[in-house]
Amino acid sequence: MSKGTLFDKVWDAHTVQILPSGQTQLFIGLHLIHEVTSPQAFAMLRERGLTVLYPDRTVATVDHIVPTEDQARPFVDTLAEEMMQALENSAKENGIRFYNIGSGNQGIVHVIAPEQGLTQPGMTIACGDSHTSTHGAFGAIAFGIGTSQVRDVLASQTLALSKLKVRKIEVNGTLPPGVYAKDVILHIIRKLGVKGGVGYAYEYAGTTFANMSMEERMTVCNMSIEGGARCGYINPDDITFDYLKGRDFAPTGDDWDKAVTWWRSMASDADAEYDDVVTFDASDIEPTVTWGITPGQGIGISEPVPTPESLPESDRAIAQEAYSYMQLSPGTPIKGTKVDVCFIGSCTNGRISDLREAAKFAKGHHVANGVKAFVVPGSERVKVQAEAEGLHKIFLEAGFEWREAGCSMCLAMNPDKLQGDQISASSSNRNFKGRQGSSTGRTLLMSPAMVVAAAVNGKVSDVRELS
């Protein structure tokens, strides 16, 4: 059993009681809500005559169903408009802080909370969204929850949870040129499998993560769930504190000093005990692209699509399914695969540093004929910052569309969707069948820089070769 880890410390600090079931009733320090998983939860509260217990610990925004082109109200999609109105009314009714379109603070929930300093070390955080593990980059324990659990947190500010085991994932060394945080997490998921983390919290450690910026760390923690882990985190350090200082909800004055002292104390002890330890060498990682229908089906850009014989027997059935769905033949190079759509954005890679890096490669190039390419900032703040730096002009001159903030093509809940059997190069986090809006649409996951290379060449390319 793990002991002395950040996970243990945060868990213990937020334990209300041990329930008869053996589960822990855990206090939730911050509850993030959006328009998709909250309407039913609020309806259940009304049915029982309940109100939100701690509205000051709840923050709402809209992201999943928001159009990124025409945001005029009412939305063309009547269901989306209905969901918008439901959250607007529920937030007002319960006194919940709500960041609506045009507020200057709206955006993908996992982008806006960190950028405003809402996400802090030592917290427990819950949200009705799979990628809540993003917030673990700050040394928080963050869980994605279902609608009934959203109801529970609204009503009681607690969750009934079983304690997880802790796996330490060490990556050491300097990342080679053209290799990013996205490649690191895709590599980890490839090696450990999409079910490898079931029952675990992942602690990311080692010199590679220590040298990452906060936004890079968020990319890594964001995809913990894709490896089966319920949450993933990185111990807070000076990089964390420097990022937080001065943000809207960060402590100030003496409270800041006290907070930093406490945050440091929550980091895993040097002699912490883990349930499992796995190590990787950063020099073994190259630009990575998924070829199949799970985030675990990734390969380096120099590798061919794997043959069934090269895979463990347990992976062969889904590989056969992937060959058929993706229309890719085993043994053929992934490099050179034609793409139709290129998407940069999402809670994985829609932050300002992602856009800066993508713009660096887009500058002086142009999107290939026949390719639709677009960039979607993760928040209104990111969009304003990008435009202040002139990044939008670089993208527009290169033939990319420049959109409003939202989840966009990460998932098929808004107008940004694939058509027919189009294939996309995407900086998002999931490549499941039909994920991007078409039952036959195909998704290749990669870093924003690699998406630019694909857009420019009209095919999967090595960004290191983009002149």
Swiss-Prot record:
Heterodimer of LeuC and LeuD. The gene is leuC. The lineage of its organism: Bacteria, Bacillati, Cyanobacteriota, Cyanophyceae, Oscillatoriophycideae. Pathway: Amino-acid biosynthesis; L-leucine biosynthesis; L-leucine from 3-methyl-2-oxobutanoate: step 2/4. It catalyses: (2R,3S)-3-isopropylmalate = (2S)-2-isopropylmalate. This is 3-isopropylmalate dehydratase large subunit. It is an enzyme of class 4 (lyase). Binds 1 [4Fe-4S] cluster per subunit. Catalyzes the isomerization between 2-isopropylmalate and 3-isopropylmalate, via the formation of 2-isopropylmaleate. Its cofactor is [4Fe-4S] cluster.
